[in-house]
């Protein structure tokens, strides 16, 4: 239950430490996160903060949503995202407030959620790293097939979740415990160490890490 930011994946680059070490980073644009609603236990049954990100033409906004945003005094956004937070943290915010990258600090571990790049219809070798069949020696048509999926008479069916060919990618993926390497407060950018899910321009959600790793050897 932590407040986070909605961002846009700009791309990857690298930065250098004072010692000259190269660090690969993903640049996330987290500008203009604005509060559209504060939900409370009394009115909604739970405590949360609703945030708008990006922009959207007025002609693309439904009348109910337009009224909702007008009540908060906030322009329409491309995305509405809700973050569950504690009641005391919600009390510090108000409709129309802008949440910036100063929500995080350099060195902090975060979880980044996005939608992975779609790969289309893929076979089991590409999708699940299956091994291929023999190139010859009696194999004429089954080089890349996954093999039998059948079961015995009992249970007499294929279990759900069987790894087979199908649509690869385009799934919600969360990468945990990424480190914030640098923050550009002027341009409202987060530079996160490592790669995050999705293509350039994709939307991501950045929240404080839930399962922070313990330092090896620490007491």
Swiss-Prot record:
Q: Which cysteines are joined by disulfide bonds?
A: none
Post-translational modification comment from the UniProt entry: Methylated by PrmB.
The identity of this protein, by name, is: Large ribosomal subunit protein uL3
- GO biological process terms on file: translation
Q: Which PROSITE patterns match?
A: RIBOSOMAL_L3
**What Pfam families does this protein map onto?**
Ribosomal_L3
NCBIfam families linked: L3_bact
Q: How does it assemble?
A: Part of the 50S ribosomal subunit. Forms a cluster with proteins L14 and L19.
């Amino acid at each position: 239950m932590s407040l986070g930011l909605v961002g846009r994946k700009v791309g990857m680059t690298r930065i250098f430490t004072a010692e000259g070490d190269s660090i690969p980073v993903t640049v996330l644009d987290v500008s203009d996160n604005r509060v559209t609603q504060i939900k409370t236990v009394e009115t909604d049954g739970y405590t949360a903060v609703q945030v708008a990100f990006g922009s959207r033409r007025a002609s693309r906004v439904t009348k109910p949503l337009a009224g909702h945003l007008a009540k908060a005094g906030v322009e329409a956004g491309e995305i509405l995202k809700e973050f569950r937070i504690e009641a005391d943290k919600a009390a510090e915010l108000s409709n129309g407030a802008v949440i910036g990258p100063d929500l995080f600090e350099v060195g902090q571990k975060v979880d980044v959620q996005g939608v992975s790049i779609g790969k289309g219809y893929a076979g089991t070798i590409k999708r699940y790293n299956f091994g291929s069949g023999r190139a010859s020696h009696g194999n004429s048509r089954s080089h890349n097939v996954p093999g039998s999926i059948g079961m015995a008479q009992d249970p007499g069916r294929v279990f759900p979740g069987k790894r087979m060919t199908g649509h690869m990618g385009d799934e919600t993926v969360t990468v945990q415990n990424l480190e914030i390497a640098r923050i550009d407060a002027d341009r409202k950018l987060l530079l996160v160490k490592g790669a995050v899910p999705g293509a350039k321009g994709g939307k991501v959600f950045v929240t404080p890490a839930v399962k922070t790793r313990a330092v090896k050897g620490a007491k």
